[in-house]
């Protein structure tokens, strides 16, 4: 690949990310903002959308997320469970797991999905 190919690939990925970000719900934007305020880095919008798509395609009823304060992914996976099932969030930081619980509590009026939050310090 030459320099032009790399530049075109970067532009394509930028377009995909911007498109995924523009489609985020208010709950996702709020989760991203809360995480930023706490200093928890989040994955890309496209990555979270891909997880949502995969969970829907597999008709998942139970999913596990492992990471440090992966709030955006949690919101996407709760949506992918269509208000049912169980989400297990394993987090290495106490701050991340506390924020996950708080965020999930805010969603509890709109979903029957259950949360199992586990703090696993490294």
Predicted features along the sequence, with ranges:
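Alpha-helical elements of Rossmann-like donor-binding domains used by nucleotide-donor carbohydrate transfer enzymes
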Residues: 11, 15, 30, 50-53
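Short, basic/glycine-rich phosphate-binding loops at helix/coil junctions
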Residues: 28-34
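N-terminal start-of-chain detector that recognizes signal peptides
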Residues: 14-15, 35-37, 89
């Amino acid at each position: 690949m030459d320099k032009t190919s790399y530049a075109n690939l970067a532009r394509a990925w930028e377009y995909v990310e911007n498109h995924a970000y523009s489609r985020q719900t208010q709950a996702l934007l709020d989760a991203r903002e809360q995480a930023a305020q706490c200093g928890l880095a989040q994955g890309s919008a496209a990555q979270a959308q891909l997880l949502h798509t995969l969970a829907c395609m597999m008709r998942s009823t139970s999913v596990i997320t492992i990471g440090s304060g992966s709030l955006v992914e949690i919101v996407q996976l709760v949506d992918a469970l269509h208000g049912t099932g169980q989400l297990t969030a394993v987090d290495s930081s106490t701050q991340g797991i506390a924020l996950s619980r708080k965020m999930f509590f805010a969603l509890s009026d709109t979903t029957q999905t259950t949360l199992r939050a586990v703090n696993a310090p490294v």
